[in-house]
């Protein structure tokens, strides 16, 4: 602030959201994901949140520290079961996403970064983070969260009907798309 030195640094080899294919914005394709972190009290522990843009399906993982290594490990772990359905990933410019190249290579996906201070460019994920806060409020220490708590939150969020999905649940839409995608892949091989 006020001409001081920038302490956050930059993440090397970032690809701007401006270069992301237009099909992602139109929500026409299954397999475009947004990711972020939700910070617990004390700013140490975090939840990695990932959601598929078309279905609004959410994945959540707890990380003991918000490091690039921990976040990339969590993202890879969450998305590996769906690796054939991961085309793009979009995040903010947080340093926790510094290992974006490792994530992209492991999942065979393209990785994009939104503009700084432009949370609306990842609106679905920011909305999801607000819903996640219903289960894990800002003042909550995340070292008290169990995997069972996370699974319960994911289940509730993914089974909540959404107006934008024609009052279907994210789980219903995700499973339909996943099944359709797997059948398409099977027919191509």
Describe the residue ranges of each PLM region:
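Short, structured coil segments at secondary-structure junctions
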Residues: 106-107
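Active-site beta-loop-alpha junctions of metal-dependent nucleic acid enzymes
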Residues: 39-43, 60-83
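Mobile genetic element proteins and their domesticated derivatives, centered on retroelements
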Residues: 36, 50, 56, 75, ...
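Mobile-element integrase/transposase regions
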Residues: 1-47
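RNase H-like two-metal-ion nuclease catalytic core shared by retroviral integrases
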Residues: 91-94, 98-101, 113-134, 143-155
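C-terminal domain-tail junction helix/linker
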Residues: 138-189
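Short small-residue beta-strand/loop micro-motif enriched in glycine and branched aliphatics
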Residues: 56-61, 113, 138-140
């Amino acid at each position: 602030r006020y001409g001081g030195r920038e302490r956050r640094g930059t993440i090397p080899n970032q690809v701007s959201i401006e270069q992301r294919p237009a099909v992602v914005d139109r929500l026409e394709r299954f397999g475009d994901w947004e990711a972020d972190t939700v910070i617990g009290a004390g700013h140490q522990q975090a939840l990695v949140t990932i959601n598929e843009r078309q279905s609004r399906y959410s994945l959540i993982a707890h990380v003991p520290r918000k490091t690039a290594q921990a976040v990339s490990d969590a993202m890879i772990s969450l998305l590996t079961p769906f690796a054939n359905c991961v085309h793009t990933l979009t995040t903010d410019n947080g340093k926790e996403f510094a290992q974006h190249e490792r994530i992209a290579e492991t999942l065979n996906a393209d990785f994009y970064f939104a503009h700084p201070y432009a949370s609306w460019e990842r609106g679905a994920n920011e909305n999801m983070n607000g819903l996640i806060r219903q289960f894990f409020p800002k003042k909550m220490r995340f070292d008290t969260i169990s995997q069972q708590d996370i699974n319960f939150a994911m289940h509730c969020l993914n089974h909540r009907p959404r107006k934008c999905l024609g009052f279907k649940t994210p789980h219903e839409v995700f499973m339909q798309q996943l099944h359709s995608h797997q059948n398409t892949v099977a027919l191509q091989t």
